[in-house]
Amino acid sequence: MGRNAKIISKSKIRRVNILILILLGTQDNSFHRLLDKVQELIDKKVITEKVIVQAGRTKFESKDMEIYSLMPEEKLREIMEKSDLVITHGGVGSIVMALKMGKKVIAVPRLSAFGEHINDHQIQIVDSFNKQEFLIGLTELDGMEEALAKAKEFKPKKFKSETDHMIKLIEDFIDNN
């Protein structure tokens, strides 16, 4: 097989130059603000990559993005595995899933001021992961273009889940007692 050959997986998701996966979470409130910014950057040709979105309950239409409300976890994991960049809301589950796969992540917290969440706890979550250099945290969407440029060279610290460590300790305890 030549270097330029394209491999098509069983699910027909082709490897293109770069794939961006966007996760908005399953919160009842809309997070269209993030998709509005992504669409703006697509229109300006800042984003030229294929974009796949799991939008949750956010209603958004775009001819430039492949948008799903929800997808089975297996399909989500398959797409995430193929992605080069994950742009996600500030939910721990989405962030940790991407980090465990070694993905570059831009995390954008949902904000109560925009009616995206009931409080601003996602700011603290994103800030914590950002300070530890696991991801690029972004509270102001005006900085998205800069964050995308930074992501090209960004080398996230390797994420090790403490949950995995605790499970191993419990398994060792059970096996040895």
Question: Which residue ranges define each predicted feature?
Answer:
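N-terminal amphipathic/basic-hydrophobic helices that include classical n-h-c signal peptides
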Residues: 1-18
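C-terminal amphipathic helix plus adjacent low-complexity
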Residues: 3-8, 150-177
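Catalytic phosphate/metal-binding cores of nucleic-acid and nucleotide-processing enzymes, i.e., regions
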Residues: 18, 68-77, 85, 101, ...
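Short acidic-hydrophobic, aromatic-tinged amphipathic segments that line or gate anion-handling sites
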Residues: 67-70, 135-143
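A donor-sugar binding/catalytic signature common to diverse glycosyltransferases
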Residues: 76-116
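Catalytic binding pocket for nucleotide-activated donors in carbohydrate/polymer assembly enzymes
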Residues: 104-139
